[in-house]
């Protein structure tokens, strides 16, 4: 995210309209694209005020719910798969509502039959060693930036260090997920993405 925001600043010198630079990402990149709109993070990474004009995120992992719910007012669109067992679409939908309720401009499009990677050309594939969240609950980010997660039995787990996250994975993660493209969804998602981006460029 830092590199992209710094790139936006450099574009000023290159006579490029930096007010029309958006960010797009897939999976983990989609997570980065989504949370790049979280203003406390953007303010830290780009203190001179560079911001993205749009945020297009394919099947992001919306695992974090910040206590400070200040978000960019730039348009945000999340493209989600209804059969994604890798990055749960339900978490993204809940966060989208939270962002919108907090004054942001976030929307989702759900492709009911879509797996993770629904726009890929690769066929449906099972990955037995992939790690995915097995929860409908968010990790929380407090005002200091510390991450925590409350389990169903009330245990509070930290999520700040590698060791913390390994312990967290042991509690709330599962092994084994499906990925795979769907040509019909691929075509629809491409059109939805182009329609979204074209509105920013007009």
Residue ranges and their predicted role:
Residues 37-41, 100-101, 198-202:
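Sec-exported extracytoplasmic/periplasmic mature domains
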Residues 1-7, 11-12:
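Single conserved hydrophobic/aromatic residue that forms the stacking wall/gate
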Residues 105-202:
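C-terminal catalytic histidine-bearing segment of alpha/beta-hydrolase fold enzymes
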Residues 13-14, 41-48, 102:
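Alpha-helix termini
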Residues 47-113:
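The feature captures the conserved acid-bearing segment of alpha/beta-hydrolase catalytic domains
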Residues 30-45:
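Short glycine-enriched nucleophile-adjacent loop
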Residues 15-27:
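Alpha/beta-hydrolase fold nucleophile elbow
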């Amino acid at each position: 995210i830092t590199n992209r925001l710094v790139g936006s600043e450099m574009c000023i010198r290159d006579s490029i309209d930096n007010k029309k630079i958006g960010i797009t990402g897939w999976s983990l990149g989609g997570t980065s694209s989504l949370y790049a709109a979280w203003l406390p993070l953007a303010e830290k990474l780009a203190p001179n005020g560079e911001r993205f004009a749009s945020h297009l995120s394919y099947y992001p992992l919306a695992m974090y719910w910040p206590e400070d719910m200040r978000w960019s007012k730039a348009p945000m669109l999340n493209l989600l798969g209804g059969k994604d067992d890798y990055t749960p679409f339900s978490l993204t939908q809940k966060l989208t509502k939270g962002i919108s309720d907090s004054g942001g401009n976030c929307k989702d499009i759900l492709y009911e039959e879509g797996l993770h990677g629904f726009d890929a050309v690769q066929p449906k594939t099972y990955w037995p060693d992939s790690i995915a969240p097995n929860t409908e609950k968010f990790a929380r980010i407090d005002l200091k930036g510390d991450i925590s997660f409350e389990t169903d039995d009330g245990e509070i787990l930290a999520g700040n260090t590698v060791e913390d996250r390994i312990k967290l994975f042991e509690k709330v993660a599962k092994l084994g997920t499906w990925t795979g493209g769907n040509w019909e969804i691929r075509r629809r998602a491409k059109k939805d993405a182009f329609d979204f981006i074209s509105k920013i460029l007009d």
